[in-house]
Amino acid sequence: GAAPGTSLRGVVAKVSAQVYGSPAAALATFGVTGTNGKTTTTFLLSYVLELLGRRPGLVGTVELRVGGQAQASAMTTPESPDLQAIVATMVERGDTDLVMEVSSHAIELHRADALSFNVAAFTHLSSDHLDFHGDLESYFAAKAKLFTPQRAAHAVICVDDVWGQRLARECELPVTTVATHISTDVEADWRVRDIVGTASGSDFTLSGRDGELRTSIALPGEFNVSNAALALVSLLASGVSLGELERVLSASGGLATAVPGRMEVVSQSPRCVVDFAHNADALELALAALRSTTTGRLHVVFGATGERDTTKRAEMGRIAVLGADEVIITDDDPHDEDPAVIRAGVASGARAAQATDAGRGTVVQEIAPRAAAIAAAVAKAGPHDTILIAGRGHETIQEVAGVNLELDDREEVRVALAAREGSL
């Protein structure tokens, strides 16, 4: 049996690595953790690795990419035997790198124990998954476990928030820090400067000891500039030179890639954007990003997930009312909880915000099911309006009381737009 104090899952991870011959040793490995931004950062990392002529395998929330073939993903980080088999297949099929999202659940449940990353990157931390970890301190401790000598050779840490700053201080690894908010008054090896918002994204400068790089990202929002900077600094930390990055990025026109369900622009008039934002922090950032480039009204369609951290429901309602002109509260994935109860939790925060000066002008409606809410928003929007459909992103299955229904927000937007064209 396992010795006391060792975890069976940890043992399984190590045995899996031995069975498959520690396949990750043949690859350059990048692990990305943090509350929001993991998926986008890993997609951007993979994109630039491809520009550099490498062949990255990808393990994450949206897809699994092995040997250049992508398939839909079931969970952020697979269980260790599956993971080792996936990595072994990558090596066999000629992949040169492994880029992986590492969730705090995966760290706590020892799924990635047998992998050691060349570079472990940290986006930021905010209250999410507290149903699993209990409080922010234990959530931080779970994330921090990735940044130990057994798990990684080098840390790249975004120091925009206090958690990143603390991780950089406490971490036992060689650390490269990056500050991406202009307002962050903290020492960092690399910083982002001169962000200019464009219709489709942002231009920005990454500047550090070794020089600077002016480039662009084709995803809206300053938080995506943060993700881009983290991806680029992770590559620099892995040994890619600034000159090489400059060469491939100027040839490609910057980080010119879309990420499924991450600030994904489905149409332009009205502009419909589908995003995975499913906590207050991400919702606030997404709304702020779209507000700055919307000449008409800003609409948001969203709900909260059932059987998850219930404290964030009212807060999401409040953020929506303060950030948008038109709010439609609908269903997300209710799971086995009564959808009306979840909507009421969100609505309570929305109504409270409407009672304040800042939220007084916002229109709030409750419309279910979700497809009807999306249709209502699209029918109502003017040509210069923006509609953010938040919470589900790339997901194509909605779980209601144990039944999986097909539902793709992007598809519902297209259907609603076609109906709108027909009635104009």
Put a short name on every predicted segment:
Residues G1-K14, Q18, V162, P220, ...:
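N-terminal leader/targeting and accessory segments in enzymes
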Residues R93, V99-M100, E108, F117-R271, ...:
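Acidic, Mg2+-coordinating active-site environments of NTP-dependent enzymes
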Residues P4, R9-V159, W163-C171:
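Phosphate-binding loop of NTP-binding sites
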Residues G68-A72, I217, E399-G402:
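Short acidic, glycine/proline-rich loop/turn micro-motifs
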Residues S80, V102, L125, F132, ...:
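Generic detector of well-ordered alpha-helical packing
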Residues G10, A28, F43, E50, ...:
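ATP-dependent carboxylate-amine ligase
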Residues S104-I107, D185, P369-A373:
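Short acidic loop-to-helix transition motifs that present clustered carboxylates
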Residues T35, T61, C158-V159, T180, ...:
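Cofactor-binding loop segments of dinucleotide-utilizing enzymes, especially the Rossmann-like FAD-
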